[in-house]
Curated annotation (Swiss-Prot):
Pathway: Quinol/quinone metabolism; menaquinone biosynthesis; menaquinol from 1,4-dihydroxy-2-naphthoate: step 2/2. Methyltransferase required for the conversion of demethylmenaquinol (DMKH2) to menaquinol (MKH2). The gene is menG. It comes from Bacillus licheniformis (strain ATCC 14580 / DSM 13 / JCM 2505 / CCUG 7422 / NBRC 12200 / NCIMB 9375 / NCTC 10341 / NRRL NRS-1264 / Gibson 46). SUPFAM superfamilies: S-adenosyl-L-methionine-dependent methyltransferases (SSF53335). This is Demethylmenaquinone methyltransferase. Keywords: Menaquinone biosynthesis, Methyltransferase, S-adenosyl-L-methionine, Transferase. One of its GO terms (molecular function) is demethylmenaquinone methyltransferase activity. InterPro entries: MenG_heptapren, SAM-dependent_MTases_sf, UbiE/COQ5_MeTrFase, UbiE/COQ5_MeTrFase_CS.
Length: 232
């Protein structure tokens, strides 16, 4: 039986959850933490803010949001992998302002206009439909609030672009096999990264989702980028 994208992705993350954090550091050469820190600086989250972290995984960005919003903030992390959430639960035990929810990014279980910020980090490329998820994120953010995506992207510089795809297609899956015994799963991750829209194309999807003043900020030669859009 041919698996849907959603089924395949769910299987990937249910399997790799124990090594996910370690592999993120290996694959990105620890750059993903710097990218997230720079994104948080762009967002400028105040104390007491409300935020939803979609596809929160093991909770790193959820925790960063909670640290910024403080004890008076209200942060929710949502993911469809119970195994990934189990790691997030361990990491967020001391955060009373964080609530973790098992749910689907395609149908967010929240009313319209609920959050000041809605984020998704390295998760959008894995959903069945990018635009549907962006529309859902735009729906639940408050007017004037921010929808923020940190994701792998497509470098445009000749030479660097070719090296990037060589790394993702051949070397990254080998790292998965070596460090996490998961060659097949990390082969999927390189496929999803390779097929993901470039920065300009993703910015257009943000606008199609109804967001305004869309900006994007490339990192490390364009191997990753943050996109920010505001709700009208």
């Amino acid at each position: 039986m041919v698996q849907s994208k959603e089924q395949r992705v769910h299987g990937v993350f249910e399997k790799i959850y124990k090594n996910y954090d370690q592999m993120n550091s290996v694959i990105s050469f620890k750059q993903h933490k710097k990218w997230r820190d720079k994104t948080m600086q762009l967002m400028n989250v105040p104390k007491g803010a409300t935020a939803l972290d979609v596809c929160c995984g093991t909770g790193d960005w959820t925790i960063a949001l909670a640290d910024a919003a403080g004890e008076t903030g209200e942060i929710k992390g949502l993911d469809f992998s119970k195994n990934m959430l189990s790691i997030a639960e361990q990491k967020t035990e001391s955060y009373s302002q964080i609530e973790l929810i098992h749910g689907n990014a395609m149908e967010l279980p929240f009313p319209d206009n609920t959050f000041d910020y809605v984020t998704i980090g390295f998760g959008l490329r894995n959903v069945p439909d990018y635009l549907t998820v962006l529309k859902e994120m735009a729906r639940v953010v408050k007017p004037g609030g921010q929808v923020v995506c940190l994701e792998t992207s497509q470098p445009e510089m000749f030479g660097f672009k070719q090296l990037y795809f060589l790394y993702f297609r051949f070397i990254m899956p080998m790292f998965g096999k070596l460090f996490a015994k998961s060659f097949k799963e990390y082969s999927w991750l390189q496929e999803s990264a390779r097929e993901f829209p470039g920065m300009k194309e993703l910015a257009a999807l943000f606008e199609e989702a109804g967001l305004k003043n869309v900006q994007y900020h490339p990192f490390t030669g364009g191997v990753a980028a943050t996109h920010v859009g505001w709700k009208r």
